[in-house]
Structure formats: structure tokens, C-alpha cells
């Protein structure tokens, strides 16, 4: 667990959220589940990747907007024509996995309900009576949005269902903050390979007025 303190070096500007995550690991046994919400490009995906790195776990990202229909459940968890499901084949090879359920709010209700059961039971039994164990899995569910949106104030049926099914089941709900101008400058300085397009989108998302050309010149002078 001491390795997890390194997360603050990778995830800049989210000290409170990282502290909540480390505390959860100190007091809870696997499987562990987190729900992380916040604006775009604030570190949600990077958190899952870095967590897998420091735990020495396999990393798997599922984009849940690909699972909006109920039939997509079979591709995810059911064996079809003797072909193992995505999660069965992954967890058979890598029982210790950090599983990122990205944009969890876009998944169909059947999948949300199913994962809420997995959080309770620690396993899933498919139609062929094969058990998929999730006992050594770290779940990270992510959603882009503000606290009012993600915590159930948004009048959407899907968000209400998500709140009802999952929020009482997850071990920790973490809010990530928008990145300040100073943090973004630090990220750019530390990661010189970051694309100009990504920087532009990040600044636009956070409504931060900044002279990008001037900043890049300053960074080159500092290097």
C-alpha cells in the first residue's frame, strides 16, 4: 500500500480524492469499488492506469457507451458459441485486475444492475453455470459531470437508476476537481509529449484563458 502514495505524483490536483482512495484500501479488502466523477481531462482514466501500475495489476478499460443495449450484456459476461465472454477470458488470465467502467452512466440498466450484484457477491455465474470471480478486482466507475449531475439532481431516468442501484453499493464516491491554470501548466511541463490539441481541449473545457504559445516558450526555456 505504500506504493499507492505515488499516485499523487501521477494525478496532479486531486490530492483529496487520492487520499480517499488510499484510505479505502487501508480499511477494505478486495474487491473494492470506486465511483469517480468530475470534468473532462481531470485524471479519472489516468487514476485507473496508475493504480494498476502501482498495484502491479492488469488494466482493462470498458467504454460503457458500447453497452447501452441489453443484448450487449452477453458479449460482456456470457459465453457465446463456446467463446468465453470478455470478462471471463480476461479474469481467467489476469485475476488481479483494475477494471475501469468508463462513462458508467451510459450503460444499460441491466448491466448496472448486474454490477451492483457483483459488488455484493464477488462473482457472477453465467448461463452455463460457470462462475466468474471478481474477488481480486478493483472497480473504478467514472462519469463526466458536476456534483449536482452525478449525485442525482439531473432529471434523467438513467442517472436516477444509477444512483439507486450503485451509489449505496460502492465503497467510495470520489469527486475530482477542475484543474487550475497552475496545475495544467505543471502537467504540460512534466509531460512534454502531450499534444497541442489535447492541451487546447483541456483549457477549453475548463474555460481557462491562456496564451498557449507563450506558455510553450516558457516551458522550453525552463527545460
Locate each region found by the language model.
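Pre-Walker A (pre-P-loop) alpha-helix and adjacent loop at the N terminus of AAA/AAA+ ATPase modules
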Residues: 2-34
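Conserved RecA-like P-loop NTPase ATPase core
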Residues: 13, 21, 45, 52, ...
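Conserved Walker
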Residues: 29-31, 85-90, 121-136, 150-151, ...
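Walker A/P-loop
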Residues: 30-62
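AAA+/P-loop NTPase substrate/partner-engagement loops
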Residues: 54-80
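Conserved AAA+ ATPase "SRH/arginine-finger" region at the nucleotide-binding site
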Residues: 62-67, 143-144, 158-160, 171-185
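Conserved AAA+/SF3 P-loop NTPase catalytic/coupling segment centered on the Walker-B
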Residues: 69-73, 92-120, 137-138, 145-152, ...
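Conserved AAA+ ATPase small/helical "lid" subdomain
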Residues: 170-188, 192-223
Amino acid at each position: 500500500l505504500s506504493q499507492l502514495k505515488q499516485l499523487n505524483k501521477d494525478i496532479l490536483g486531486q490530492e483529496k480524492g487520492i487520499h480517499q482512495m488510499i484510505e479505502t484500501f487501508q480499511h477494505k479488502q478486495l474487491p473494492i469499488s470506486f465511483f469517480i466523477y468530475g470534468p473532462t481531462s481531470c485524471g479519472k482514466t489516468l487514476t485507473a492506469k496508475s493504480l494498476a501500475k502501482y498495484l502491479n495489476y492488469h488494466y482493462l478499460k470498458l467504454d460503457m457507451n458500447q453497452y447501452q443495449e441489453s443484448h450487449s450484456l452477453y458479449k460482456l459476461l456470457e459465453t457465446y458459441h463456446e467463446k468465453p465472454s470478455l470478462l471471463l477470458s480476461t479474469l481467467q488470465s489476469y485475476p488481479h485486475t483494475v477494471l475501469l467502467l468508463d462513462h458508467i452512466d451510459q450503460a444499460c440498466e441491466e448491466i448496472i444492475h448486474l454490477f451492483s450484484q457483483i459488488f455484493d457477491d464477488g462473482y457472477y455465474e453465467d448461463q452455463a453455470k460457470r462462475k466468474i470471480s471478481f474477488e481480486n478486482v478493483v472497480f473504478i466507475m467514472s462519469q463526466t459531470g458536476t456534483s449536482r449531475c452525478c449525485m442525482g439532481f439531473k432529471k434523467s431516468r438513467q442517472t436516477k437508476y444509477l444512483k439507486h442501484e450503485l451509489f449505496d453499493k460502492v465503497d467510495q464516491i470520489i469527486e475530482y476537481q477542475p484543474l487550475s491554470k497552475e496545475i495544467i501548466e505543471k502537467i504540460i511541463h512534466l509531460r512534454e509529449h502531450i499534444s497541442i490539441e489535447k492541451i487546447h481541449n483541456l483549457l477549453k473545457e475548463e474555460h481557462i484563458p491562456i496564451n498557449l504559445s507563450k506558455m510553450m516558450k516558457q516551458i522550453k526555456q525552463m527545460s
